């Protein structure tokens, strides 16, 4: 019974972590969209001037590749956690059936 409660506790923690990762994914998408919007609104042909304007507006996240990479890593981590969640859920159901029979 203790193993079952431990598995349920870990399953709940994984669900909370998946929720936090979804929030992080939304924040990354929002930040990426804001940078692209600022980039399109400026419409400056000189890339040096565009980078300087973007540095004034968003100095901490100019590299779109870093944003897209961290977004992909967040999505991959979310998939891995969902797989772990399903395995633990199956284990919990199995343990519950074994204890009931």
Curated annotation (Swiss-Prot):
Membrane topology designation: Single-pass membrane protein
Record's keyword annotation contains Nucleus: no
KW Disulfide bond (keyword) present: no
Transmembrane residue ranges: 81-101
Gene Ontology cellular-component annotations: host cell membrane; membrane
Keywords assigned by UniProt, alphabetized: Host membrane, Membrane, Signal, Transmembrane, Transmembrane helix
Protein location: Host membrane
Span of the signal peptide: 1-23
Pfam families hit by this protein: Corona_7
Record InterPro entries: Corona_7 (IPR003449)
Protein's job: May function in the formation of membrane-bound replication complexes or in the assembly of the virus.
Family: Belongs to the coronaviruses ns7/ns7a protein family.
Protein's recorded name: Non-structural protein 7a
Organism, as annotated: Canine coronavirus (strain K378) (CCoV)
Organism lineage string: Viruses, Riboviria, Orthornavirae, Pisuviricota, Pisoniviricetes
């Amino acid at each position: 019974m203790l193993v079952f409660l431990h598995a349920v506790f870990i399953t709940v923690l994984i669900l909370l972590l998946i929720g936090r990762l979804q929030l992080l994914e939304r924040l990354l998408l929002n930040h990426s969209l804001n940078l692209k919007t600022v980039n399109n609104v400026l419409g400056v042909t000189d890339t040096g001037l565009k980078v300087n304007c973007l540095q004034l507006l968003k100095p901490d996240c100019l590299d779109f590749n870093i944003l897209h990479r961290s977004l992909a890593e967040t999505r991959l981590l979310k998939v891995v956690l969902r797989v772990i969640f399903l395995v633990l859920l199956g284990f919990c159901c199995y343990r519950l059936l074994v204890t009931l029979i």
